[in-house]
């Protein structure tokens, strides 16, 4: 378990019984090169996901913060070197100034790459949202997180899950008193499909735009407890202003 992830989840122990909420349960193995904006954050091991939004910036979750991060782009099987991967150290790691490790509000992080990524068939960018997505929108969630709701199985190959965004009312009803206006829920109230440990920071892509960041949840794929995601449409101005100030 990673110390800053412990901090994030101890802060809300009732809601976050596990160390880092970043896996896919009930999904499928993504087709190779089908999620070229997905990155792996590495500190000698994969610990979180992220999304490439331009050739030098990645969006992830603030609770994924570590002092030193290597961003791995073009990954599919994270257990082997396949050729075409790009490993680039972070030169700046910027958490949202109002991030709360207690509530996980404003759970968003920007990473500047030390050198620009080379955009190609394996590595490309995901657009920021032009507007907030509505409930019912089908989205693609991806990551290398745990694939079991009970037990542990971390896959080598990138996993995908198609899931709908839920209404704010359903989200609040699932987690009374814990959902802020900066959070969205996605998934299935009946359970069985969800993100989980190892997927944190990864993308929720809806109609070609980054609408969510894997943030937290109660367990994984539990009935009545959908995944909770950072609502990226609330942060477009902050992202653009932060990039401009650190270019």
From Swiss-Prot:
<keyword id="KW-0645">Protease</keyword>
<keyword id="KW-0479">Metal-binding</keyword>
<dbReference type="Pfam" id="PF00089">
    <property type="entry name" value="Trypsin"/>
</dbReference>
<feature type="active site" description="Charge relay system">
    <location>
        <position position="63"/>
    </location>
</feature>
<dbReference type="InterPro" id="IPR050127">
    <property type="entry name" value="Serine_Proteases_S1"/>
</dbReference>
<feature type="domain" description="Peptidase S1">
    <location>
        <begin position="24"/>
        <end position="244"/>
    </location>
</feature>
<dbReference type="GO" id="GO:0005576">
    <property type="term" value="C:extracellular region"/>
</dbReference>
<dbReference type="InterPro" id="IPR001254">
    <property type="entry name" value="Trypsin_dom"/>
</dbReference>
<dbReference type="GO" id="GO:0030574">
    <property type="term" value="P:collagen catabolic process"/>
</dbReference>
<feature type="disulfide bond">
    <location>
        <begin position="196"/>
        <end position="220"/>
    </location>
</feature>
<feature type="active site" description="Charge relay system">
    <location>
        <position position="107"/>
    </location>
</feature>
<feature type="disulfide bond">
    <location>
        <begin position="139"/>
        <end position="206"/>
    </location>
</feature>
<feature type="disulfide bond">
    <location>
        <begin position="30"/>
        <end position="160"/>
    </location>
</feature>
<keyword id="KW-0378">Hydrolase</keyword>
<dbReference type="GO" id="GO:0005509">
    <property type="term" value="F:calcium ion binding"/>
</dbReference>
<feature type="binding site">
    <location>
        <position position="85"/>
    </location>
    <ligand>
        <name>Ca(2+)</name>
    </ligand>
</feature>
<keyword id="KW-0964">Secreted</keyword>
<keyword id="KW-0106">Calcium</keyword>
<dbReference type="GO" id="GO:0006508">
    <property type="term" value="P:proteolysis"/>
</dbReference>
<feature type="binding site">
    <location>
        <position position="77"/>
    </location>
    <ligand>
        <name>Ca(2+)</name>
    </ligand>
</feature>
<feature type="propeptide" description="Activation peptide">
    <location>
        <begin position="16"/>
        <end position="23"/>
    </location>
</feature>
<dbReference type="GO" id="GO:0007586">
    <property type="term" value="P:digestion"/>
</dbReference>
<keyword id="KW-0720">Serine protease</keyword>
<dbReference type="InterPro" id="IPR009003">
    <property type="entry name" value="Peptidase_S1_PA"/>
</dbReference>
<dbReference type="InterPro" id="IPR043504">
    <property type="entry name" value="Peptidase_S1_PA_chymotrypsin"/>
</dbReference>
<keyword id="KW-0222">Digestion</keyword>
<feature type="site" description="Required for specificity">
    <location>
        <position position="194"/>
    </location>
</feature>
<keyword id="KW-0865">Zymogen</keyword>
<feature type="disulfide bond">
    <location>
        <begin position="48"/>
        <end position="64"/>
    </location>
</feature>
<dbReference type="GO" id="GO:0005615">
    <property type="term" value="C:extracellular space"/>
</dbReference>
<dbReference type="InterPro" id="IPR018114">
    <property type="entry name" value="TRYPSIN_HIS"/>
</dbReference>
<keyword id="KW-1015">Disulfide bond</keyword>
<dbReference type="GO" id="GO:0004252">
    <property type="term" value="F:serine-type endopeptidase activity"/>
</dbReference>
<feature type="signal peptide">
    <location>
        <begin position="1"/>
        <end position="15"/>
    </location>
</feature>
<keyword id="KW-0732">Signal</keyword>
<dbReference type="InterPro" id="IPR033116">
    <property type="entry name" value="TRYPSIN_SER"/>
</dbReference>
<feature type="disulfide bond">
    <location>
        <begin position="132"/>
        <end position="233"/>
    </location>
</feature>
<feature type="binding site">
    <location>
        <position position="75"/>
    </location>
    <ligand>
        <name>Ca(2+)</name>
    </ligand>
</feature>
<feature type="disulfide bond">
    <location>
        <begin position="171"/>
        <end position="185"/>
    </location>
</feature>
<feature type="binding site">
    <location>
        <position position="80"/>
    </location>
    <ligand>
        <name>Ca(2+)</name>
    </ligand>
</feature>
<comment type="similarity">
    <text>Belongs to the peptidase S1 family.</text>
</comment>
<feature type="active site" description="Charge relay system">
    <location>
        <position position="200"/>
    </location>
</feature>
